[in-house]
Amino acid sequence: MDLIYIPEDLSSCPKFGNKSCPPTNRSFRVRMIMYLFMTGAMVITIFGNLVIIISISHFKQLHSPTNFLILSMATTDFLLGFVIMPYSMVRSVESCWYFGDSFCKFHASFDMMLSLTSIFHLCSIAIDRFYAVCDPLHYTTTMTVSMIKRLLAFCWAAPALFSFGLVLSEANVSGMQSYEILVACFNFCALTFNKFWGTILFTTCFFTPGSIMVGIYGKIFIVSRRHARALSDMPANTKGAVGKNLSKKKDRKAAKTLGIVMGVFLACWLPCFLAVLIDPYLDYSTPIIVLDLLVWLGYFNSTCNPLIHGFFYPWFRKALQFIVSGKIFRSNSDTANLFPEAH
């Protein structure tokens, strides 16, 4: 999600001429290093999430409610890497927007939409894991295909309506005279918020769902510990039978992994959303380099997700081998066993 630094003194703005770019003080070497680093993050984001999308879509063994939510979230991360990050990279390195005002509004709207969509997906995944671990007897009747479809529709539609409605109406910059002058003078494109909408965005779109996720995973952790303790107290000859009803090890492991995904998300996006909340009350005095770093820290979350899957999910590594080796193109490859340890 884009942020903006608005200088207090805009009297020097006209000397650049209307819709010009202020000169950058970054050397060629610094710009090349920035391009290399950002391009690397972008490539990992695009291809890593593409592997997740292909794997869950192709292999029937991965067709589960949780994985369909993960597939949709990977699509969000893929779009961020493919559509948003390239243009943000040029803007961050060159300190200028070369792509026009109309595309600027689309870019800002789509950027915010994807950020919020990720949050909503994580909330949905947390709910799914809650029922799987804490109420397994009712999981299959609660998290049905129709329920997953409704969750996915909400995860995409609500952020889209909110983001595009807010940016296109320009309600987020209402009353910000400095912003209007800056846009008139420079080839400039960044998403910023006045005090009202900055507070609304942080409270309703980050703090509230973030608190819900933390609460749900806290409950999952407590229940998992209780199950593990109960299993350890069982006689050896009854552990196997009781374990199937008391707790599913795979579900607990999945909940733990997705909890790590949630933790990384909060760590990456919390500083950015705090800037959205606080910067308007500081008269937008946060240096532009700091805001750029916060934005790219948020983007980096989409880079981390496939790396987390690769580290914690054996099926991801197995599916990657199928894709890289070309075995995925063989007949009946969609029925391949990605969990050999389960047999």
From Swiss-Prot:
Give me the disulphide-bonded residues: 21-185, 104-189
Gene Ontology terms, MF aspect: trace-amine receptor activity
- Membrane topology summary: Multi-pass membrane protein
What effect does gene inactivation have here? Mice lacking Taar3 show decreased sensitivity to isoamylamine. Mice lacking Taar2, Taar3, Taar4, Taar5, Taar6, Taar7a, Taar7b, Taar7d, Taar7e, Taar7f, Taar8a, Taar8b, Taar8c and Taar9 show no visible phenotype or behavioral deficits. They however show an absence of aversion to low concentrations of amines such as 2-phenylethylamine, isopentylamine, N-methylpiperidine and cadaverine.
Query: What's one Pfam family here?
Result: 7tm_1
Q: In which tissues is it expressed?
A: Specifically expressed in neurons of the olfactory epithelium.
Q: What InterPro entries does its record include?
A: GPCR_Rhodpsn (IPR000276), GPCR_Rhodpsn_7TM (IPR017452), TAAR (IPR050569), TAAR_fam (IPR009132)
GO BP terms, alphabetized: sensory perception of chemical stimulus
Going by the entry's taxonomy, the superkingdom of the source organism is recorded as Eukaryota
Which residue stretches are annotated as topological domain Extracellular? 1-35, 90-150, 194-198, 279-287
Residues with attached carbohydrate: 18, 25
- Topological domain, Cytoplasmic: which ranges? 57-68, 169-172, 224-257, 309-343
Where do transmembrane segments lie in this chain?
36-56, 69-89, 151-168, 173-193, 199-223, 258-278, 288-308
Please give the residue ranges the record annotates as the region Extracellular Loop 2 (ECL2). 173-186
Q: Which keywords appear in this protein's UniProt record, sorted alphabetically?
A: Cell membrane, Disulfide bond, G-protein coupled receptor, Glycoprotein, Membrane, Receptor, Transducer, Transmembrane, Transmembrane helix
GO cellular-component terms in the record? plasma membrane
Main localization category = membrane
Tell me where it resides.
Cell membrane
Q: What does this protein do?
A: Olfactory receptor activated by several primary trace amines, including isoamylamine. Activated by isoamylamine and cyclohexylamine, but not to the corresponding alcohols, isoamylalcohol and cyclohexanol. This receptor is probably mediated by the G(s)-class of G-proteins which activate adenylate cyclase.
Q: Member of which family?
A: Belongs to the G-protein coupled receptor 1 family.
Q: What is stated about domains?
A: In addition to the well known disulfide bond common to G-protein coupled receptor 1 family, trace amine-associated receptors (TAARs) contain an unique disulfide bond (Cys-21-Cys-185) connecting the N-terminus to the extracellular Loop 2 (ECL2), which is required for agonist-induced receptor activation.
What is the protein's given name? Trace amine-associated receptor 3
Gene that codes for this?
A: Taar3
